[in-house]
Amino acid sequence: MGVHECPAWLWLLLSLVSLPLGLPVPGAPPRLICDSRVLERYLLEAKEAENVTMGCSESCSLNENITVPDTKVNFYAWKRMEVGQQAVEVWQGLALLSEAVLRGQAVLANSSQPFEPLQLHMDKAISGLRSITTLLRALGAQEAISLPDAASAAPLRTITADTFCKLFRVYSNFLRGKLKLYTGEACRRGDR
């Protein structure tokens, strides 16, 4: 073993420690989110969760209104935004959506008769949002929050969700809309 070589187990250990912290993993592709198959996997999971909740009634009520990001996109305004401004909007939306899904999980945990398939999809959504957050950090989206554009960004538009179906619909639409638009543009430009 030379002076600059590290054993394989050390790279693995560094990778396991770095991922949850959102740090770049040595030897890993730094722009994994630019691979369309990665985002498509999370889109499929979100759509499956939405479809499962369409069929349930009372067991899918949140019994409260949870604030979620508005997923409507004005494409004309979006295209005119700087990539940094888009990153701010996506990052804020992702943070709010993560809070909403965690709140939904808490509501489900306190339910007297939890709908079993719903718990599985809540867990997948939480895991997916954490992974997407890590991938966006690797793309440099978090750094945009500290840029001057972030201070002048319009406040995030929000709506409320009162059912798990609506919560998962917002999750699915957010991934298909703003997140996909932002990552597509950031990956094309090579912004980091």
Swiss-Prot record:
Record flagged with keyword Signal: yes
Recorded GO MF terms: cytokine activity; erythropoietin receptor binding; hormone activity; protein kinase activator activity
Family (UniProt): Belongs to the EPO/TPO family.
Role summary: Hormone involved in the regulation of erythrocyte proliferation and differentiation and the maintenance of a physiological level of circulating erythrocyte mass. Binds to EPOR leading to EPOR dimerization and JAK2 activation thereby activating specific downstream effectors, including STAT1 and STAT3.
Keyword Amino-acid biosynthesis: no
GO cellular component: extracellular space
Keywords, sorted A to Z: Disulfide bond, Erythrocyte maturation, Glycoprotein, Hormone, Secreted, Signal
Biological process according to GO: erythrocyte differentiation; erythrocyte maturation; erythropoietin-mediated signaling pathway; positive regulation of cell population proliferation; positive regulation of Ras protein signal transduction
Segments crossing the lipid bilayer: none
Entry-linked Pfam families: EPO_TPO
Protein name as it appears in the record: Erythropoietin
Record-annotated disulphide pairs: C34-C187, C56-C60
Naturally occurring in which organism (per UniProt): Macaca fascicularis
Superkingdom of this protein's organism: Eukaryota
